[in-house]
Curated annotation (Swiss-Prot):
GO cellular component: mitochondrial inner membrane; mitochondrion; ubiquinone biosynthesis complex
Modified residues (N6-acetyllysine): K175
Acidic residues composition-biased segments: 86-97
Origin species: Homo sapiens (Human)
Outcome recorded upon mutating M302A: Significantly decreases membrane association
GO terms for biological process, alphabetical: mitochondrial electron transport, NADH to ubiquinone; ubiquinone biosynthetic process
Subunit field text: Homodimer. Heterodimer; two heterodimers of COQ7:COQ9 come together on the same side of the lipid pseudo-bilayer and form a curved tetramer with a hydrophobic surface suitable for membrane interaction. These two tetramers assemble into a soluble octamer with a pseudo-bilayer of lipids captured within. Interacts with COQ7; this interaction allows ubiquinone (CoQ) isoprene intermediates presentation to COQ7 and facilitates the COQ7-mediated hydroxylase step.
Function description: Membrane-associated protein that warps the membrane surface to access and bind aromatic isoprenes with high specificity, including ubiquinone (CoQ) isoprene intermediates and presents them directly to COQ7, therefore facilitating the COQ7-mediated hydroxylase step. Participates in the biosynthesis of coenzyme Q, also named ubiquinone, an essential lipid-soluble electron transporter for aerobic cellular respiration.
Gene: COQ9
Residues given in the record as a 1,2-diacylglycero-3-phosphoethanolamine binding sites: R244
Entry keyword Chaperone: no
Composition bias, Polar residues: 52-66
Name of the molecule in the record: Ubiquinone biosynthesis protein COQ9, mitochondrial
Amino acid sequence: MAAAAVSGALGRAGWRLLQLRCLPVARCRQALVPRAFHASAVGLRSSDEQKQQPPNSFSQQHSETQGAEKPDPESSHSPPRYTDQGGEEEEDYESEEQLQHRILTAALEFVPAHGWTAEAIAEGAQSLGLSSAAASMFGKDGSELILHFVTQCNTRLTRVLEEEQKLVQLGQAEKRKTDQFLRDAVETRLRMLIPYIEHWPRALSILMLPHNIPSSLSLLTSMVDDMWHYAGDQSTDFNWYTRRAMLAAIYNTTELVMMQDSSPDFEDTWRFLENRVNDAMNMGHTAKQVKSTGEALVQGLMGAAVTLKNLTGLNQRR
């Protein structure tokens, strides 16, 4: 998600797009893989770039979790199958969209070695037993692979948030304060970038391209909307928009800090995040203050976009 995309979106025309995209709607979610938000946040703090499964329960707060989920073998390595009336199993029809999804999911394994490139996609296709020529189904700039990854990360985060909500409703977990909830939500989402952090500046520069801004903005607004929804936000006035704009700015500025952070386990990044969330909460007690806070953060984000431009293509982490 590009910082410039957010700052542009919060301008005159972009702000209207954000308003249209972020309308409160009822949510109907699918059944989720059991996992706990707080346990995931704590577990992710203790993990490095090793891929491991998230903890299953709230009590497993110190279990290590994966930075990026491994593709589901059923969905990644074979097309859908069905059993005919004779009892013989045959391959079901696989749409082009389903095939592309499988290829992109498999390609993520090769991003650390090849970056967000056609080479990574070709390797992913070959790992599925397909020809490397399948990479020609996608553009050469890697934008489809990046957007696929961002979509997967947002889906994982939603599952984590929903699972915690269920635990709270069942009385198996204590509802946390809004600032703590938002801080952990942003950290959990950002930790999903760790296995790909060396190539993430390049990914952000690609997401800044004009043809990628609508999709990138849509994914960002959807993510921060989910965070506020599960945090218990029920505002229906102008605060509904400013809170989401404010959180989007916090996410993107923290993302930029993370790309340059060389501290152990990104400790400086999480400290920066905690300070920004605390500042936003302390300054946001009235509608007027919330609006001022959001405007100030957006101005800062516009400056951060310049920083990102300078970082593009360069590895700033030591």
